[in-house]
Curated annotation (Swiss-Prot):
InterPro entries from the UniProt entry: Ribosomal_uL14, Ribosomal_uL14_bac-type, Ribosomal_uL14_CS, Ribosomal_uL14_sf
Subunit structure: Part of the 50S ribosomal subunit. Forms a cluster with proteins L3 and L19. In the 70S ribosome, L14 and L19 interact and together make contacts with the 16S rRNA in bridges B5 and B8.
Gene name linked to the record: rplN
Pfam families noted in UniProt: Ribosomal_L14
GO cellular component: cytosolic large ribosomal subunit
GO biological process: translation
HAMAP family documented for this protein: Ribosomal_uL14
Function: Binds to 23S rRNA. Forms part of two intersubunit bridges in the 70S ribosome.
Species, as recorded: Parabacteroides distasonis (strain ATCC 8503 / DSM 20701 / CIP 104284 / JCM 5825 / NCTC 11152)
CDD domains: Ribosomal_uL14
Protein's name according to its UniProt entry: Large ribosomal subunit protein uL14
């Protein structure tokens, strides 16, 4: 469950390391975001000489959350961190690699993230 002011790890090679959620998209009263939701983030830390600049505002999709996700078969899955992947203006992912596992729930909407991920849980 990601809300405003939540800090997330950026799980791609776009150049950003950490992002801060500044808005959850999807309605006027939507407070929390989970895996597969799109949020607006501010970049808080970057690696040197990257295309992404500190303080830049971008859209991102959530790929991992610490809060467990209930699956239709009754099982739950949770991760060790909150992570996102940055999106460009067209809605495509900004980087060319994904780091760490991603949730299977992304298959319904984002096949590109699932195909680039090293592990899908």
């Amino acid at each position: 469950m990601i809300q405003q002011e939540s800090r997330l790890v950026v799980a791609d090679n776009s150049g950003a390391k950490e992002a801060l959620c500044i808005r959850v998209l999807g309605g006027t009263r939507k407070r929390y975001a989970t895996v597969g939701d799109v949020i607006v983030v501010a970049i808080k830390s970057v690696i040197p000489a990257s295309d992404v600049k500190k303080g830049a505002v971008s859209k991102a999709i959530i790929v991992r959350t610490k809060k467990e996700i209930r699956r239709p078969d009754g099982s739950y899955i949770r991760f060790d961190d909150n992570a996102c992947v940055l999106l460009n203006a067209g809605g495509d992912i900004r980087g060319s690699r994904i780091f760490g596992p991603v949730a299977r729930e992304l298959r319904a909407t984002n096949m590109k993230i699932v195909s680039l991920a090293p592990e899908v849980l």
